[in-house]
Amino acid sequence: MRTTFFKLWVHAIFHINENSVLIDPDLESLFYLEIEKRFIEQGCEVAIVKGNLDHVHILFTQNPLLPLHETMRFVQGISQRWYQMHDFKTGWYKFKWQEAYCAYSVSESAMEKAHFFIENQGEIHQNLSYWDEIEHLNLLHNVDLTDEHSDVEMQSWQSRFSFKHIGKEFL
């Protein structure tokens, strides 16, 4: 084959550091635009950026010429600095992302569901904690959790977890 064909959709999640201030609702839409702009600068196509006061979901295509971790670090770093420069209520130094992030592959056939899931973050988090959301996504994408959870903890979590209380199956 003479040409490389590449299209990898990624559902990424950034969460604020435990000592960080929450994302100000007054800055939220501008902040999402800034995050989108930074992904585009990295050669990514962005489908949606949306989140909640403590985390942000991004659905984008990965640039085949860059490692994912470089894209994520760049966007986290620049967007963190942008937020710090625009948050006049709490002080510039009080907003910080966690260094860790989540990144899941999304097939073209699952794009509509992933987009819907991200678009409806406000509704989802009325009934679901961030950590339950992450655990569900990890299970859905078969992420190995054995280092962080015992089998008993996972069985307990699986028995109580259900998306039925959200009103629609999102993923």
Say what each PLM segment does.
Residues M1-L171:
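Basic nucleic-acid-binding interfaces
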